[in-house]
Amino acid sequence: MSIVIGADAAGLRLKEVVKDFLEKENFHLVDVTAEGQDFVDVTLAVAAEVNKEEQNLGIVIDAYGAGPFIVATKIKGMVAAEVSDERSAYMTRSHNNSRMITMGAQLVGDELAKNIAKGFVNGKYDGGRHQIRVDMLNKMG
């Protein structure tokens, strides 16, 4: 499993904080950030890498998280969530089988961002009654 991470200019500093944290937790990271990229391009790059392997997960950071979330929801088969708290990050994995989260550097601080990332990457999909909803999401687009 790889954690694919990317950020636009507004999210660069926080991306480095999250990246360093996850590397210290022994996760394999793929950073697709390229200088001058818009959040649209960053999100598409993260999604492309996430979709290479079923186990891969993605994190996109910009100013507010909303833009990358909108982009991610346009990608067929991508279940994503905009999160700004640890519980939502964990629950979107366990109930929605989300493969990507977005967050805003102007909304969350360093410690919260680390906890959000930790909750997301450590979350496990519960399946069961949630699979009906996930199947519905995967048919969309």
Curated annotation (Swiss-Prot):
It comes from the Bacteria. The keyword Isomerase applies. Keywords: Isomerase, Lactose metabolism. SUPFAM superfamilies: Ribose/Galactose isomerase RpiB/AlsB. It catalyses: aldehydo-D-galactose 6-phosphate = keto-D-tagatose 6-phosphate. Signal peptide: none annotated. Pathway: Carbohydrate metabolism; D-galactose 6-phosphate degradation; D-tagatose 6-phosphate from D-galactose 6-phosphate: step 1/1. InterPro entries: LacA, RpiB_LacA_LacB, RpiB_LacA_LacB_sf. Pfam families: LacAB_rpiB (PF02502). Its EC number is 5.3.1.26. It is an enzyme of class 5 (isomerase). One of its GO terms (biological process) is lactose catabolic process via tagatose-6-phosphate. One of its GO terms (molecular function) is galactose-6-phosphate isomerase activity. Gene3D superfamilies: Sugar-phosphate isomerase, RpiB/LacA/LacB (3.40.1400.10). Belongs to the LacAB/RpiB family. NCBIfam families: lacA (TIGR01118), PRK08621.1 (NF006380), PRK12613.1 (NF009257), rpiB_lacA_lacB (TIGR00689). Heteromultimeric protein consisting of LacA and LacB. This is Galactose-6-phosphate isomerase subunit LacA. It comes from Streptococcus pneumoniae (strain Taiwan19F-14).
